[in-house]
Swiss-Prot record:
Function (record text): This is one of the proteins that binds to the 5S RNA in the ribosome where it forms part of the central protuberance.
Name of the protein described by the UniProt record: Large ribosomal subunit protein bL25
Keyword annotations: Ribonucleoprotein, Ribosomal protein, RNA-binding, rRNA-binding
Source species of the chain: Thermobifida fusca (strain YX)
InterPro entries per the UniProt record, alphabetical: Rbsml_bL25/Gln-tRNA_synth_N (IPR020056), Ribosomal_bL25/Gln-tRNA_synth (IPR011035), Ribosomal_bL25_b-dom (IPR020057), Ribosomal_bL25_C (IPR037121), Ribosomal_bL25_long (IPR001021), Ribosomal_L25_dom (IPR029751), Ribosomal_uL5_bac-type (IPR020930)
Length: 194
């Protein structure tokens, strides 16, 4: 699990205008909440935050918010729909040893059996793990699985200390038969002429 240090500064101005000014200055407005504390408004450096958020379920260590550092997980990230830059982030305060529920990507390994195609129903699985030990992904070995096989959430091999936080009967992927190629118009005309 990666942990990234980011310098945060308290926000004193609120509203749309203040948020726009912060973004123009290269900052991203954020809200810090959790553990029964009142929500706190902060600004984070935009570039550093963008790089950190490229890692799924990254644990951020905020410096400059309190007298001590805060460990947080990004819960909600809002991006500009056109340009893609960060507009706002909600951060959940966590503590070492605390278990949190997060979505972890499924990493497919291997090739399915002959004539089969892997149908990915879910790209992520919801798990409960210690905040400082969230896996970066869960490997799913599909090597040689025959057509008609379903892989459920309960079939996933989870790392030590990680529990499934979703229904174990949920199908996450299945192996289906390859679709027969459709005949082209030229082939159909050729068959009709014979």
């Amino acid at each position: 699990m990666s942990e990234v240090r980011i310098a945060a500064e308290p926000r004193t101005e609120f509203g749309k205008g203040a948020a726009r000014r912060a973004r123009r200055a290269g900052k991203v407005p954020a809200v810090l909440y959790g553990h029964g504390i009142a929500p706190r408004h902060i600004n984070l450096p935009g570039h550093d935050l963008m790089l950190a958020l490229k890692t799924p379920n990254v644990l951020l260590r905020l410096e400059g918010v309190d007298e001590k550092e805060s460990l947080v997980l990004p819960k909600s990230v809002q991006r500009d729909p056109i340009k893609g830059f960060l507009e706002h982030v909600d951060l959940l305060v966590v503590q070492r040893g605390e278990k949190v529920v997060v979505e972890v990507p499924l990493l497919v390994k291997g090739e399915v059996g002959a004539g089969g195609v892997l149908n990915l129903e879910m790209a992520q699985a919801e798990v409960r793990a210690e905040a400082t030990r969230i896996p970066e992904g869960i490997e799913v070995d599909v090597d040689g699985l025959p057509i008609g096989t379903n892989v459920t959430a309960g079939d996933l091999k989870l790392p030590e200390g990680v529990e499934l936080a979703m229904d174990p009967e949920t199908i996450v992927m299945s192996v289906v038969a390859e679709a027969a190629p459709e005949a082209t118009e030229e082939e159909e005309e050729g068959e009709a002429a014979e």
